[in-house]
């Protein structure tokens, strides 16, 4: 008999709406044994009704993450095979339409696999396993990926701090096959991009900004572009291909800026009008403001400012400050493309923060377009937390 996690009265409502998380403070008791980290458990309402089947995480505030809401569905190799097949099938049209050789294959909870992120870069699959359930099924997951994607190497980038909340150490290394020499070259929308899955951020690259890079390219022809927190320079790469008059790529990492140069070269683009600036963006923006320097288009794609609710107020102040300074650097009628990748920063709150920045900058701002993560990063209707990337196109007068 399966171990059963009984909820407190009234705590079943979120699971009835198919939200996949069970918090520790909602659990009444555990029956049928003592589950170990990653074990599969059944979750029942206080009145005994079966609700879902998930993975036990004893050290996390989220103590169960639901694998399935189907009582007849076992959690085994076939389960993972079905989830992977469904995820790939749901992305086939996008892959064909945009000519993708790099895309998100598995988007964790939004693809029914909590804590599991898998990105494909050409013939390399990069996995991030963030909780005890994912950890427990690592070998099975690798076996199923190898069966469905023969010829692909499988590499793990679970070198993230969030694993500490699960009592797990960071892990990085080859899981299957032979890793090719870095960088890997992927393509999107006819543009080639160099990706280092070993040393790069996250799993190697920010696939979620693909659609937004294309949006940015619509505004840059003949314009001066400041690309902040540029990483490997792909907003600048799209801008160069779209005919920007000048581009300044700014990042604190010399390695990232070298890859930005390489990206221009592998696309056969002249970068004589491109400046690569190794600097702290916050300090540089203030310096440029003091010098009276201006631009036609600015891209602000900063790192996450808030990891938990206690940091949200500080994050709002940070976003407001950096957007205010960016607005002060824009020529009248200029375009600001600004982003937040903090899941706690809801879309309406982010827009309010940017509107407040406009007031402080004493600039009139029109919101032209809202942006979000690319469609290979879907958002489950039952899991709004999956909507993490928010962006705004703002015209600044």
Curated annotation (Swiss-Prot):
Residues 2-80 form the PUA domain. It comes from the Bacteria. This is Ribosomal RNA large subunit methyltransferase I. GO terms for molecular function: RNA binding; rRNA (cytosine) methyltransferase activity. One of its GO terms (cellular component) is cytoplasm. It holds the Pfam family PUA_3. PROSITE patterns: PUA (PS50890). It is an enzyme of class 2 (transferase). PANTHER family: RIBOSOMAL RNA LARGE SUBUNIT METHYLTRANSFERASE, S-ADENOSYLMETHIONINE-DEPENDENT METHYLTRANSFERASE DOMAIN-CONTAINING PROTEIN. The gene is rlmI. HAMAP family: 23SrRNA_methyltr_I. Its EC number is 2.1.1.191. Keywords: Cytoplasm, Methyltransferase, RNA-binding, rRNA processing, S-adenosyl-L-methionine, Transferase. It catalyses: cytidine(1962) in 23S rRNA + S-adenosyl-L-methionine = 5-methylcytidine(1962) in 23S rRNA + S-adenosyl-L-homocysteine + H(+). Belongs to the methyltransferase superfamily. RlmI family. InterPro entries: PUA (IPR002478), PUA-like_sf (IPR015947), PUA_sf (IPR036974), RLMI (IPR023542), RlmI-like_PUA (IPR041532), SAM-dep_methyl-trfase (IPR019614), SAM-dependent_MTases_sf (IPR029063). Specifically methylates the cytosine at position 1962 (m5C1962) of 23S rRNA. Its main location: cytoplasm. It is found in: Cytoplasm. It comes from Shewanella denitrificans (strain OS217 / ATCC BAA-1090 / DSM 15013).
């Amino acid at each position: 008999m399966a171990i059963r996690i009984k909820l407190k009265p009234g705590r079943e409502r979120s699971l009835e709406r198919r939200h996949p998380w069970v918090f520790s403070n909602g659990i009444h008791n555990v029956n049928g044994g003592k589950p170990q980290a990653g074990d599969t458990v059944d979750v029942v309402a206080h009145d005994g009704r079966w609700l879902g089947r998930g993975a036990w995480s004893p050290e996390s505030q989220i103590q169960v993450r639901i694998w399935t809401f189907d009582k007849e569905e076992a959690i085994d190799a076939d389960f993972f095979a079905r989830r992977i097949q469904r995820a790939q099938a749901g992305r086939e049209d996008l892959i064909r339409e945009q000519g993708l050789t790099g895309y998100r294959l598995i988007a964790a909870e939004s693809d029914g696999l909590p804590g599991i992120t898998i990105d494909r870069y050409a013939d390399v699959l990069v996995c991030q396993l963030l909780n005890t359930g994912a950890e427990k099924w690592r070998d099975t997951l690798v076996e199923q990926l190898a069966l469905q994607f023969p010829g692909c190497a499988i590499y793990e980038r679970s070198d993230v701090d969030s694993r500490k909340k699960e009592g797990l150490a960071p892990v990085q290394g080859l899981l299957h096959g032979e890793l090719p020499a870095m960088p890997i070259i992927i393509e999107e929308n006819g543009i080639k991009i160099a990706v280092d899955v070993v040393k790069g951020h996250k799993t190697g690259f920010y696939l979620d900004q693909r659609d937004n890079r294309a949006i940015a390219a619509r505004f840059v022809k003949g314009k001066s572009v400041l690309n902040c927190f540029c990483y490997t320079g792909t907003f600048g790469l799209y801008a160069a291909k779209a005919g920007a008059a000048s581009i300044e790529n700014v990042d604190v990492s010399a390695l990232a800026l070298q890859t930005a140069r390489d990206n221009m070269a592998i696309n056969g683009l002249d970068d004589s009008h491109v400046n690569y600036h190794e600097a702290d963006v916050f300090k540089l923006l203030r310096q440029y403001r003091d010098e009276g320097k201006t631009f036609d288009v600015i891209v602000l794609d900063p790192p996450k400012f808030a990891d938990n609710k206690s940091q949200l107020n500080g994050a709002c102040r940070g976003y407001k400050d950096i957007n205010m300074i960016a607005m002060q650097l824009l020529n009248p009628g200029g375009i600001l493309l600004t982003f937040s990748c903090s899941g706690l920063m809801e879309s309406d709150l982010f827009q309010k923060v940017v509107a407040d920045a406009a007031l402080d900058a004493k600039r009139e701002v029109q919101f032209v377009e809202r942006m979000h993560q690319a469609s290979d990063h879907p958002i489950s209707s039952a899991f709004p937390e999956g909507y993490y990337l928010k962006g705004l196109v703002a015209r600044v007068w």
